[in-house]
Amino acid sequence: MDTTLLDEELASVLESFPVSDLWSDLDATRARAAEMRAKLTGKLPKVESVETEDHSITRSDGPNIPVRVYRPKIKSGQLPGLLWIHGGGYCFGSVEGDDYVVRQLVDAVGCVVVSVDYRLAPEYPFPAPMQDCLDALKWLANNTEMLLVDPDRLSIGGISAGGGLAAGLALMVRDKTDIRLIFQLLLCPMIDDRCVTSSSYLITDKRIWNRHSNLIGWKHYLNKEETCEKQPYESISQYAAATRATDLTGLPPAYIAVGSVDAFVDEDREYAARLQQSGVAVQLEVFDGGFHGFEFIAPKARISQDARELHYQALRNALFAC
């Protein structure tokens, strides 16, 4: 990866990132990621304006699903609702790991958020994580009165693999439910299992999400023996990889954001263009010099603050303009 392409502040932050092997011991990586996230958020100001409540909701094919509900303390009455789906390459991440991210979002936007702790690959490959997200969305839609959520202002969103799950969920909701979504917030979404775009080859730096991790993440999520480099995948569900969809009509308006130095920038641009060609309203933001997930990994950088504000403004416009 050519680090001269990075924003100067982000390049400086990247120098402090460790080079690590994510895949040799998944449990250790998950524990280390949780520790690093706690260390990072511990240095940030607390978000006192948001209250939370944990629930355990019915899963359609197994034990209950943990979800966390976030709500602004100072707002009363019905508010718009967002199902938030955390990132982590389909193999890492948790509700707890995204807790600070969601608190910031709720504080800035003023909506109710349900964050879902979906099952992870490789222990639970597709369709298990997607089914958990669908079950969580159905729970949100069926409990709007209890949650004080406006049933006519439901949305979904996520980052990285969470953005990929959100994109697939939007397709599934269109095809298989009567839930009406008014918006999808897709932050650097991981949506193309084929890994053949130019940008997917360029990011090899082991300090950030790179091509190798992308190949392994998809292999685990799709329950394959080999990566797609060794054995191209066929007949992949559009709900697993949204770029596989041939019909993008009838989907909710989308906000898609990604850094210019992200393995996903090409697939995200292409998906945004295809949505627009299908009559779906799209706001695409490409942040010059941003690596994967920069706005939350390096939260104090100027570019990160600007990016988050654009995310929040897009969500405010979608949820409160109607």
What kind of region is each of these model predictions?
Residues 151-152, 168-322:
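Alpha/beta hydrolase fold serine-hydrolase catalytic domain that processes acyl esters and thioesters
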Residues 124-146, 311:
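Alpha/beta-hydrolase active-site loop
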Residues 158, 162, 166:
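Gly/Ala-rich beta-loop-alpha elbow adjacent to hydrolase catalytic centers
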Residues 1-69, 227-232, 320-322:
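A glycine/proline-hinged amphipathic helix-loop "lid/cap" segment
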Residues 141-156, 176:
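Gly/Ser-rich "nucleophile elbow"/oxyanion-hole loop immediately N-terminal to the catalytic nucleophile
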Residues 78-87:
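Short beta-strand element of the alpha/beta-hydrolase
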